[in-house]
Amino acid sequence: MSQIKLIVGLANPGAKYEETRHNAGEWLVNELARVFNVTLKEEAKYFGKVAKINTPQGEVRLLVPTTFMNLSGKAVGSLANFYRIKPEEILVAHDELDLLPGVAKIKQGGGHGGHNGLKDIIAALGNSNNFYRVRIGIGHPGHKDLVASYVLGKPSPSDQPLINVAVDEASRCVELLFKEGIVKATNRLNGFKA
C-alpha cells in the first residue's frame, strides 16, 4: 500500500469561479490547509498554489492548480515529476456529477467520466489513471446538455450545506488516511451520507 504524497484540489482560477460546483475539489484542499494551519502559496513552476503539511505518514503536498480545469495535468505533472511522486501516491479531489450532494467517495483508478480535469491529469501522468480520487457529489442537472452550465454555477441554497458537510467529512477521512491508511478512510467515507 503506497502512501499519499500529493493531494490535489481541482478548480478553475479566480474569484468568478471559487463558489462554483466545479471547484468542490479546491474546497477540500482549502479545508485541509485550514486544519493543518498552512497557507497555500502560488508557485509558478508548479502552475498552482502549493503547501506542505506534516502528517503521521510524512510530508504531503497540497496543490490547487491555477490553470483552467482542462489544463490541470500541467500542475499535477510538474509537481509529481519534481518530487518523483508516483500516480498511486496522488489523491485528486474533484466534483462528481454521479453522486448526490452530501455524499463523497474515495476510489482508485477508473476513467475520467467526461471530467476535463481528470482527463488532463491522466494524460499528464503518462496515461496512468492509477491515482486515488475523492469524488465530491454535486448532483446531476438531468441532461448532458446542461452539464457545462451546471458545473460552472453555484450550488443551490439547499445543496450547498450538504456539499459542505461532505467536504468536512472527506477532510476528516483524509486525516484518518494519514493515521490508519486508505482502506479505513475509504470505508468510512464511502459509507457516509449527510
From Swiss-Prot:
It is found in: Cytoplasm. Signal peptide: none annotated. It is an enzyme of class 3 (hydrolase). Its main location: cytoplasm. The record marks 95 as: Stabilizes the basic form of H active site to accept a proton. It catalyses: an N-acyl-L-alpha-aminoacyl-tRNA + H2O = an N-acyl-L-amino acid + a tRNA + H(+). The gene is pth. The record marks 12 as: Discriminates between blocked and unblocked aminoacyl-tRNA. TRNA binds at residues 17, 68, 70, 116. The active site is at 22 (proton acceptor). HAMAP family: Pept_tRNA_hydro_bact (MF_00083). Monomer. GO terms for cellular component: cytoplasm. One of its GO terms (molecular function) is peptidyl-tRNA hydrolase activity. One of its GO terms (biological process) is rescue of stalled ribosome. Belongs to the PTH family. SUPFAM superfamilies: Peptidyl-tRNA hydrolase-like (SSF53178). Hydrolyzes ribosome-free peptidyl-tRNAs (with 1 or more amino acids incorporated), which drop off the ribosome during protein synthesis, or as a result of ribosome stalling. This is Peptidyl-tRNA hydrolase. Keywords: Cytoplasm, Hydrolase, RNA-binding, tRNA-binding. Its EC number is 3.1.1.29.
